[in-house]
Amino acid sequence: MVLQLGKLETEDIIATGKALQALAYVDPNRIGIMGWSYGGFMASLAITKGADIFKMAIAVAPVTNWRYYDNIYTERFMRTPAENEAGYDGNSPINFVDKMKGKFFLIHGSADDNVHYQNSMEMINALVKANKQFDLFIYPDRNHGIYGGNTRNHLFTMMFDYVLKNL
């Protein structure tokens, strides 16, 4: 994990996906992944680096480039970008979107003060540049928790429906 946030976790997730594919009672064409925050980062890496395994991913408020995340947290594990460019680039989903094959749903709150909205904007730019189709939903003025009013109900209903439709 040191100097390589996401590398070993992604390898584990892909290995788990492969193990699931080998089970007689699992449809290998219906394996998906979802996550929020760091989990959204992992889902984004899984659908790109594990493109042959995962047919769908939902990423809520994902880190897509460690250069945009809280430097006190990130540099504790990764050092600075100048000291560890390979660690930053080798584990940022934006650098692997060309491999993506499955359905991808990106969700973010525009007022997120933890994983800044810029992460999703960077992912969108990378996906468009690679001519990858994806789904996107932005919650205006919602923070990292995406809650308030009917927001949480809306979010979970939308994610549930996405899984039903795409797996």
Where do the PLM segments sit?
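Active-site-proximal cap/loop segments of hydrolase catalytic domains
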Residues: 1-167
